[in-house]
Amino acid sequence: MIKVQREAEPAVLNLTDSDSIGFKELEAAKKTTFTKDTKFPFEAYKDESVKNLLKKMFNGKCGYCESIINVTSYEEIEHFRPKKAINIEGIQGLTYPGYYWLAMSWNNLLISCQRCNRSHKKNYFPIENESNRAKAPGEESGEEVLLLNPCEDDPSEHLEFKDTGIIEFKEGSKKGEKSIKVYALHRRELTEERAKVAKDIELKKVQILDGLSTLKVLLRYQEDSDLQKEIEKTVSNIISLYDFIFEYENDPNRPYQAMVTQITSDFLSERKELINKLKTTSNRKNSCEQSHISS
């Protein structure tokens, strides 16, 4: 999970516009009593413009697990606060009503994969004290929410990843602990997918270190013209590997970016100056060769 900047709401969910679908739906919902048997047509959030904007915001990834959403796992518009009913720990069945007045609220909408939404998050929305549970519009501010919202929280302050793909909550983080459980961010198949990415990144880190060690030896004999090509090849490979990791860490379109950032940031920063020197030297040499060819 990574922090995501929420964009301005699409026109259909402009709740200050009395002509918008969202506004009309909200007014109708306020006049409805929600029970198990209530059939209310929540439709505003299903508008194609809403889904498209959410997909763009989250770069085609699940807002919870950061997996790429593809044809084998369709995206679903997720209500952070459940719209119709709530699963409350310790209470059997669903509790009514849910946060019906937020069903068409842009700030309550995220996008998720089916696994996170249907199999795990479902209608759960744990808070610190049930007596503070909002039952009417405007009462949400009194809740101490126990789940991470990628558009409101910085997940990196609550979640910690290992280079094996394992996720843990940071000490003292109730939100981190509860989010891992409710979103099932520790589920086996998800951990295995993160592990594949982590293994590839860790391999590249080892290759960079090996390359730097090799380069150190080669540079002792840099006057030997027969070794120049080997030196150039080694430098090029080191730079390529470093850039791959750097670009992955900074590309929000990549899956499990949060994990990659955590397991690579120190490694990259500690070698940034050295890599820049190698790039400068390599570019200068290439420039000289081009000038020689041109002349």
Swiss-Prot record:
Keyword Hydrolase: yes
Any single GO BP term: defense response to virus
Key word Hydrolase present: yes
Xref: InterPro entries: HNH78-like, HNH_nuc
Listed name of the protein: Septu protein PtuB
Keywords: Antiviral defense, Hydrolase, Nuclease
Single Gene Ontology MF annotation: nuclease activity
Knockout consequences: When this gene is missing the Septu type II system does not confer resistance to SpBeta in B.subtilis.
NCBIfam families: retron system putative HNH endonuclease (TIGR02646)
Function: Component of antiviral defense system Septu type II, composed of PtuA and PtuB. Expression of Septu type II in B.subtilis (strain BEST7003) confers resistance to phages SBSphiC and SpBeta. May be a nuclease.
Gene: ptuB
